[in-house]
Design a protein with these regions (language model features):
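Short beta-strands within extracellular/lumenal beta-sheet-rich domains
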Residues: 57-74, 116-121, 149
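Extracellular glycan-recognition surfaces and repeat-rich motifs
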Residues: 20-51
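Short, surface-exposed beta-strand/strand-loop-strand elements in extracellular ectodomains
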Residues: 94-103
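Extended extracellular/luminal ectodomain segments enriched in beta-structured repeat modules
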Residues: 73-81, 128
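Extracellular carbohydrate recognition and processing domains
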Residues: 103-126
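Short beta-strand-plus-loop segments that form exposed binding edges in beta-rich domains
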Residues: 133-142
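Sec/Tat signal peptide C-region and signal peptidase I cleavage site
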Residues: 14-18
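A short, hydrophobic C-terminal helix/tail in secreted or cell-surface proteins
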Residues: 158-176
Length: 181
């Protein structure tokens, strides 16, 4: 086996397209997510997983802004899609919901919309990107926002990519063994 063959095998393995996992399972099981409050007392309910999760924003009475985040790491490059069903007690301007991508917040709720909103959101990730969901509270007063996220799908590595990398590793180990003997 030559260096060129190894390079071609590695290139083929790394250029494989991603598969898609549907629901909060496998690489996107709730155990692989991180929950964070910053000046907020929100919470996440994963009892509906893998079909859905629910995120509830802060209302700690501080009068200051805060965030409730639920984030994970992209297992492969591809598209993340999810449906969301949102409600708030004090108006969407005060408690917007959206998604995070590498720390940047993209709001999906409409500040001028009703206290009940829903939709579908889609964005692209690269392997290793941090992404997730956020409820931002401007004031931590007058009630919380809640969102249920369902029909979640996200990219995972193709099984053939993993298999190719394992084969490549085995070939490399075999060559090293043969070279010694």
């Amino acid at each position: 086996m030559t260096v060129t063959t190894v390079s071609l095998t590695l290139a083929a393995a790394s250029s494989s397209s991603a598969a898609t996992v549907f629901g909060f399972q496998d690489a996107y099981d709730p155990i692989n997510w991180t929950f964070t409050n910053s000046n907020a007392d929100g919470f996440v309910n994963t009892g509906g997983a893998p079909a859905s999760i629910s995120l509830t924003g802060g209302n700690n009475g501080s009068g200051g802004s805060g965030t409730t985040d639920y984030t994970t790491t992209a297992a492969a490059a591809g598209t993340v899609t999810f449906d969301w069903n949102y409600s708030t007690a004090d108006g969407p301007f005060w408690d917007p919901f959206g998604y995070l991508l590498n720390g940047s917040f993209t709001q999906v709720t409409n500040n001028g919309g009703g206290v009940f909103q829903n939709g579908t959101s889609t964005f692209n990730v690269l392997a290793g990107d941090s992404f997730g969901f956020r409820i931002f509270t401007r004031d931590n007063l007058f009630g919380r926002a809640r969102v249920t996220i369902s029909n979640f799908s996200a990219p995972i590595p193709e099984p053939s990519t993993v298999l190719s990398l394992l084969v490549l590793g085995g070939l490399g180990a075999g060559l090293k063994y043969l070279k010694r003997n």
